[in-house]
């Protein structure tokens, strides 16, 4: 009879209010139902989880609070964003997407239904969910909330198992079940090995018992990804301090947070961790697909855009080099994604028609040798593209200032990580990436005035000596010839490009996630092994949807948070 009575019990879920008090909702039922509705008090210790998105993953508005970059979900894509930006040229992009003319937009879409710990739209907004991409992140954040806050009895966390434990079948058995200490647990979907066949440290029941003593409200932190990540780091510090403060009310106690980052958000979090007293307020950090030392594809996009890399993304980010440069050059945050000195030398190559490299850069300093190379055609920025039609031109000096900020930022975080850091990154050849950018050359259709210059002269050419429209079509010498021909009764125009040499940027050449090469993703353990608790290489993972679409990435994040929860100060 005891179990039958327990099985009939009814429970109402408590949701925290903005003042960290709790409230429950219950609909009136038939008077024949006399069983009491029970409310279980959640733990009074709080360790908030703060999600920090990647570049372009935060919603932005202009200074009148009109959205200019809004990642709301329409049939699993940011359809309105794609439509709006696909119609904007380089000038419009330059006008709208400037760090001093934009700010974080806080009123993006939020979930319509309750989550495990959030009871209404206002609370989602207050916790920052409206600041970040609904398309890329909300599905994951809802999943994480359910995992961390859906059940407080560790004996009922079905992702963790041990053969010595029986499985409760009835509600009564579940309510009475307790997890014993001293067990080594198996975790669902967790890989057996991290990287280089290194073993994964198991979760113990003691860690689960420690985790069960706290709540883990899920917050999101949007930032202006056009501005320097140094500024974003300072804003993150302010948000963390605010979150800790608001979770210290009455008998509720909070002293630390856990950070989970995506892509460039990892650079923001690392910089924040270096600010005074912040490492003590952060239990640890989980980094996903972070360009730890930069990504060479950032250079490639400045030169030829994204059309041949990803047509759909190119409509938004920029189909050609002119559209990308218009925003990139005036945005310190974007420039901070370029390969740093720690990325290493020799990632930019120019090859002759036989495949032999005739130029390899940088030798040491990518900032002076490539990013501020003003004359050479292979320099990061074509100065003419700083002044697009209908835009608001920036001068070379402003670009130089932004590159200097990137250099200083890179050096400030180089090799520096929180003492409790977990990492996962894309590896293997399934997706591929660009560890190097390679310019291939071949003989063009000879012009009338062909001078017969050898390929070895190509690296010495200036911007003015190269013809390009910002796509992956560059020409040395020659001209564009347009002629009219008849096809049946119709006249059509035929375009022919003559040149001494044609130059094309090669495709993917290394393991990675499509954006970040494995050599950058794995850099944390190589440069700071004592700070890295576990580092996972995942084959087949894609960069933008890493948290949304990869069950293994989700499991690793859940594992890392569980490990970090056991290290939290719950006094």
State what each model feature region is.
Residues 384-571:
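C-terminal subdomain of alpha/beta-hydrolase-fold enzymes, centered on the catalytic histidine
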Residues 52-55, 340, 426-427:
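Structured loops at beta-to-helix junctions and adjacent beta-edge loops in soluble globular domains
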Residues 284-287, 291-397:
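Extended catalytic-interface subdomain
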């Amino acid at each position: 009879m005891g179990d039958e009575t327990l099985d009939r019990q009814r429970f109402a879920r408590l949701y925290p209010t903005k003042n960290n008090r709790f409230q429950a909702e219950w609909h009136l039922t038939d008077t024949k139902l006399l069983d009491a509705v029970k409310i279980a008090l959640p733990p009074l210790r709080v360790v908030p989880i703060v999600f920090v998105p990647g570049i372009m993953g935060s919603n932005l508005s202009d200074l009148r609070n009109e959205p200019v970059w809004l990642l709301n979900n329409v049939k699993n894509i940011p359809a309105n964003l794609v439509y709006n930006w696909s119609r904007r040229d380089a000038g419009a992009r330059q006008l709208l997407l400037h760090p001093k003319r934009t700010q974080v937009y806080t009123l993006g879409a939020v979930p319509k239904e309750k989550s495990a710990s959030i009871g209404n739209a206002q609370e989602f907004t207050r916790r920052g969910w409206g600041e970040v991409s609904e398309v890329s992140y909300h599905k994951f954040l809802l999943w994480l909330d359910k995992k961390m806050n859906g059940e407080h009895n560790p004996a009922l966390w079905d992702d963790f198992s041990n053969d010595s434990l029986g499985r409760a079948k009835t509600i009564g058995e579940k309510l009475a079940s307790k997890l014993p200490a001293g067990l080594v647990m198996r975790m669902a979907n967790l890989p057996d090995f991290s990287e280089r066949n290194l073993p994964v440290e198991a979760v113990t029941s003691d860690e689960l018992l420690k985790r069960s003593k706290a709540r883990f409200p899920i917050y999101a932190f949007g930032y202006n990804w056009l501005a320097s990540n140094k500024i974003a780091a300072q804003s993150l510090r302010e948000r963390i301090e605010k979150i800790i403060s608001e979770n210290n009310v009455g008998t509720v106690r909070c002293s630390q947070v856990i950070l989970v980052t995506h892509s460039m958000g990892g650079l923001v979090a690392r910089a924040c961790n270096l600010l005074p007293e912040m490492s003590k307020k952060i239990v640890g950090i989980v980094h996903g697909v972070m360009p730890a030392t930069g990504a060479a594809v950032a250079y490639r996009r400045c030169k030829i855009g994204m059309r041949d890399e990803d047509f759909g993304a190119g409509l938004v980010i920029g189909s050609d080099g002119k559209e990308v440069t218009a925003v990139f050059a005036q945005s310190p945050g974007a420039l901070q994604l370029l390969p740093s000195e720690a990325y290493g030398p020799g990632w930019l190559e120019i090859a002759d028609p036989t495949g032999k490299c005739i130029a390899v850069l940088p030798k040491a300093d990518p900032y002076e040798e490539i990013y501020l190379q003003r004359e050479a055609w292979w320099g990061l920025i074509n100065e003419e593209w700083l002044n697009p039609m209908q835009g608001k031109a920036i001068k070379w000096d402003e670009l130089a200032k932004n590159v200097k900020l990137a250099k200083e930022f890179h050096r400030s975080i180089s090799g520096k990580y929180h003492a409790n850091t977990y990492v996962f990154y894309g590896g293997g050849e399934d997706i591929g990436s660009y560890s190097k950018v390679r310019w291939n050359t071949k003989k063009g259709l000879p012009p009338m005035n062909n001078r017969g210059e050898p390929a070895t002269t190509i690296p010495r050419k200036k911007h003015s000596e190269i013809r390009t429209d910002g796509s992956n079509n560059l020409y040395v010498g020659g001209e564009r010839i347009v002629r009219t021909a008849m096809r049946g009764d119709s006249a059509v125009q035929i375009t022919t490009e003559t040149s001494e040499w044609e130059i094309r940027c090669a495709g993917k050449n290394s393991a990675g996630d499509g954006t970040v090469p494995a050599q950058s993703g794995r850099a944390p353990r190589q440069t700071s092994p004592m700070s890295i608790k576990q580092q996972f290489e995942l084959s087949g993972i894609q960069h933008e949807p890493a948290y949304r679409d990869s069950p293994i990435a989700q499991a690793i994040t859940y594992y890392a948070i569980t490990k970090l929860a056991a290290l939290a100060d719950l006094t």
